[in-house]
Amino acid sequence: MAGTARHDREMAIQAKKKLTTATDPIERLRLQCLARGSAGIKGLGRVFRIMDDDNNRTLDFKEFMKGLNDYAVVMEKEEVEELFRRFDKDGNGTIDFNEFLLTLRPPMSRARKEVIMQAFRKLDKTGDGVITIEDLREVYNAKHHPKYQNGEWSEEQVFRKFLDNFDSPYDKDGLVTPEEFMNYYAGVSASIDTDVYFIIMMRTAWKL
């Protein structure tokens, strides 16, 4: 994925700069996540998923507040309350965190989403809806990796490092879901102005 690290750095710098003037709580939270790079929003999603003990995909205010604290998000309590109110659309005291993450994700055009899903489907060789090391063996030759060639990494490590790009730094399980893949590229997408350039980059990177 040539260029992604550079985009990541540029995006983090841009996000930090914008944070100094942003006043909308959703925008401020989005920028704080993007300031950590492409995986920032996905990482926050993982924190919330771990906290969702009963797997009902919802969070109450206390859980929401704790999740933001655990992820070291800097926000006033009033801001967090306003955020929560905006997501608690029916006023029942809980928010749906899938909806929350979707709103937090930087907006992307339909063309960008389509090319991201094309890449996901190409990588998901077994068609089970997640990308694993087994899938990568089919599409990616680890033996060409310089660290494999110099004996520093095993084949397994090369694949694992590759998946770690998309996996959250807070809970690396070696599985990449469509949601994680989309969240990662939403971060990359935020640093690329035109659809044309983004689509060319994706097609080149994944030989689509």
From Swiss-Prot:
SUPFAM superfamilies membership: EF-hand (SSF47473)
Taxonomy, superkingdom: Eukaryota
Keyword ATP-binding: no
Gene: CAPSL
GO cellular component, one term: cytoplasm
Name of protein: Calcyphosin-like protein
Gene3D superfamilies documented for this protein: EF-hand
Annotated EF-hand domain residues: 39-74, 75-110, 111-146, 154-191
Keywords: Calcium, Cytoplasm, Metal-binding, Repeat
PROSITE patterns: EF_HAND_1, EF_HAND_2
SMART domains in UniProt: EFh
Residues annotated as binding Ca(2+) 2: 88, 90, 92, 94, 99
GO terms, molecular function: calcium ion binding
Subcellular location: Cytoplasm
PANTHER family associated with the record: CALCYPHOSIN, CALCYPHOSIN-LIKE PROTEIN
Positions annotated to bind Ca(2+) 1: 52, 54, 56, 58, 63
Organism of derivation: Homo sapiens (Human)
Pfam families: EF-hand_7 (PF13499)
